């Protein structure tokens, strides 16, 4: 196949302007409405719900947006790509983001890759106490869930590769706490052979061979879902997605 100098794929947004205001979300969910986008990323989730949307955080330098999830368990919003990245054909693939939360309660956060990013995207994995429950068939990323016993820690979750992940949260705990009103840089890398790495603030926290299928096509997402009757949210400074172009197609 013919090739050119555009062999690297980089999707990036600093979120210095666009938003999908909560009070206008019904317009985006109406029949026949175009799928909402922010920069190079698509927006999925329960946009027809009352509390959901994506708003600018005015006065915060660099440009930030706030994902506003919903006040129902499992309802929320994600910013990400379509299912377009194959670890074996596009790898290494990576997603990096800088995030912050005003509080760590009443929310479930997923940052990483998943094979499921439908218009009404759900959490790739749910959690309660010390039990992780898979939802999507393939995923690899960070989870922070207020329903976990260790609700402030980031967890390294994965499914779909040669290795079966534990469903006990303590086995996946990175011992890296999120702190309310403090930002963190989170990065997930996946090699062509399915080996995954999790970084927090530039430090390698975990490596897992056979974490994810090498052939299943993935989407990169940053998502926030509610867990109770209190609306959830997540502030995002930037999202970067990196991959290599597959010249064989």
Per-range role (PLM):
Residues 193, 200-219:
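Short, solvent-exposed beta-strand-to-loop segments that form ligand-recognition rims
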Residues 158-185:
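Short, aromatic/His-centered strand-loop micro-motif at the edge of beta-sheets
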Residues 1-107, 244-249:
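Low-complexity, Ser/Thr/Pro/Gly-rich disordered linker/stalk regions
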Residues 110-112, 197-199, 240:
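Beta-strand signatures of extracellular beta-sandwich domains
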Residues 3-4, 8, 210-249:
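Ligand-recognition surfaces built from glycine- and aromatic
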Residues 15, 95-97, 181-191, 196-198:
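Short tryptophan-centered beta-strand motifs in secreted/extracellular beta-sheet-rich domains
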Residues 95-97, 109, 184-186, 220, ...:
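Hydrophobic residues positioned within well-ordered beta-strands of beta-sheet architectures
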Residues 66-154:
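Secretory/extracellular carbohydrate-interaction modules
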